């Protein structure tokens, strides 16, 4: 079956590599890393290539920090009778990702990121139609249909279960509920993002993604002629560890606004950065 991979960043491009390694037939619809996926372009591609059976995309593309219009894209694909598979690694639990309401067949995410658990444990939320269907996996470990048959009704893993990570996830879910669930976490991450971008703006440092497409998960900033190595060393000495952006054509760096972090932390970060810039180094 032919896949349509819609990409606008490094993680969408990784899907292409995965499709190649799995020997899948695919076609690609690409956008600039600072431009959200255009639902109309997806519709046009589906009209031009009716043999496409499945549409794949990344919801929150952290290469640049933009959020793609998942509901609109999934709705178009579903209306055309396509299967919709989504990478929600950095959006699950912080953005709406309702399978039924959006028309998504399966999404993949992780216990860390917006759930604020530990990494290592990945999971898939999928329709019963897919999970109870015939497996087409070429990997024993990644055969989700087989794993599903073990989990229900007996609750078993096929292999040794990651007990420690599962317990950490359970605690993370308790804290998620205690905080107030999706709306409360969205509000905190948005407040983090606002504190960060406002502080950066005062320093003359701007983000590279247009505001209408910018997520509150991670933001990529244009460094201009600032030395990343020097800035990194100074911030690390002040207790902040950041990492460079994935964009190769610009001098950029990225800062995430998820995790057990609050606006006051970003205010302190911007204060430290201001001191570095004023030092003339």
Go through the PLM ranges and name each one.
Residues 1-13:
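Conserved PLP-anchoring active-site segment centered on the Schiff-base-forming lysine
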Residues 37-93:
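Active-site phosphate-binding strand-loop segment of PLP-dependent enzymes
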Residues 100-112, 122:
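Conserved active-site segment immediately N-terminal to the catalytic lysine
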Residues 112-198:
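Active-site C-terminal subdomain of aminotransferase-like
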Residues 206-235:
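Conserved PLP-binding catalytic core of the aspartate aminotransferase-like
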Residues 238-254:
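Conserved PLP cofactor-binding pocket of PLP-dependent enzymes
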Residues 253-281:
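PLP-dependent enzyme catalytic core of the Aspartate aminotransferase-like
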């Amino acid at each position: 079956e032919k896949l349509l991979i819609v990409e606008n960043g490094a993680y969408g491009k990784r899907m292409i590599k995965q499709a190649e390694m799995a020997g899948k037939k695919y076609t690609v619809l690409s956008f600039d890393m600072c431009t959200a996926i255009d639902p109309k372009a997806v519709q046009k591609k589906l009209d031009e290539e009716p043999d496409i059976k499945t549409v794949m995309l990344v919801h929150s593309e952290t290469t640049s920090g933009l959020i793609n219009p998942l509901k609109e894209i999934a709705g178009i694909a579903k209306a055309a009778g396509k299967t919709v598979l989504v990478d929600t690694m950095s959006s699950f639990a912080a953005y709406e990702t309702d399978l039924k309401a959006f028309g998504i067949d399966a999404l993949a995410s992780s216990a860390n990121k917006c759930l604020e658990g530990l990494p290592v444990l990945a999971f898939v939320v999928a329709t019963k139609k897919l999970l109870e269907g015939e497996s087409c996996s070429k990997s024993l470990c990644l055969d989700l249909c087989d794993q599903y048959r073990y989990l229900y009704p007996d609750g078993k893993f096929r292999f040794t279960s990651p007990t420690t990570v599962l317990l950490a996830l359970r605690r993370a879910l308790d804290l998620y509920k205690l905080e107030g669930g999706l709306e409360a976490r969205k509000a905190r991450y948005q407040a983090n993002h606002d504190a960060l971008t406002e502080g950066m703006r005062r320093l003359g440092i701007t983000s590279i993604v247009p505001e209408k497409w910018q997520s509150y998960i991670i933001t990529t900033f244009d460094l201009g002629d600032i030395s990343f190595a020097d800035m990194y060393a100074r911030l690390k000495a002040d207790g902040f560890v950041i990492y460079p952006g994935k964009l190769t054509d610009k001098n950029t760096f990225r800062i995430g606004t998820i995790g057990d972090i609050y606006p006051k932390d970003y205010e302190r970060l911007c204060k430290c950065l201001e001191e570095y810039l004023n030092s003339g180094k």
